[in-house]
């Protein structure tokens, strides 16, 4: 359900930026939509991999975790394949470096209220999804690949902070401080 509603949320985001935005609004709306849909393709592959790796009976996260005995029944090699896919999918949504390039254009072209929704809700869904799905259902791969998390989040923090410091437009400051 989370994936489905995340995809449905792209439609109003595209319209809010593309119709009521300013500046290069069509470019920003299309870039946001295409990048988030590209991330969704990776995420969908990861979700289907988790579904089939867990027995293919349900898409409910709690039922999968209970059915697989705390998610350790998914083979380690499969976890190493599905975890990066879910991580990239949620990383694009959360605007994690290097998947953040949609964020500055989307924030700058969006109406102010939509820009705040991006920073306050949409981008946080990426981090929530990564913790709730990827790390909860694929714990062995998350533990083994945690160094990648640390490197990318460290780069995101430093890059976002320095990029926000040199901006003069308030929407770009908001965009880079959200990376």
Where are these regions (language model features)?
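Short phosphate-coordinating micro-motif centered on Lys-Gly-acidic
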Residues: 7
């Amino acid at each position: 359900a989370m994936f489905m509603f995340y995809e449905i949320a792209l439609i109003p985001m595209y319209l809010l930026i593309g119709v009521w935005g300013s500046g290069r609004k069509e470019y920003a709306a299309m870039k946001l939509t295409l990048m988030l849909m590209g991330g969704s393709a990776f995420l969908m592959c990861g979700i289907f991999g988790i579904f089939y790796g867990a027995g293919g009976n349900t898409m409910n996260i709690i039922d999968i975790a209970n059915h697989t005995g705390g998610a350790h029944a998914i083979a380690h090699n499969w976890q190493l394949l599905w975890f990066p896919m879910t991580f990239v999918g949620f990383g694009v949504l959360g605007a994690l470096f290097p998947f953040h390039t949609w964020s500055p254009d989307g924030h700058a072209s969006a109406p102010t209220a939509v820009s705040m929704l991006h920073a306050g809700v949409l981008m946080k869904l990426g981090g929530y999804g990564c913790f709730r799905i990827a790390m909860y259902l694929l714990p062995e791969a998350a533990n083994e690949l945690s160094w990648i998390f640390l490197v990318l989040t460290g780069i995101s923090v430093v890059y976002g902070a320095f990029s926000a410091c040199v901006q003069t437009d308030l929407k770009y400051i908001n965009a880079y401080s959200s990376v």
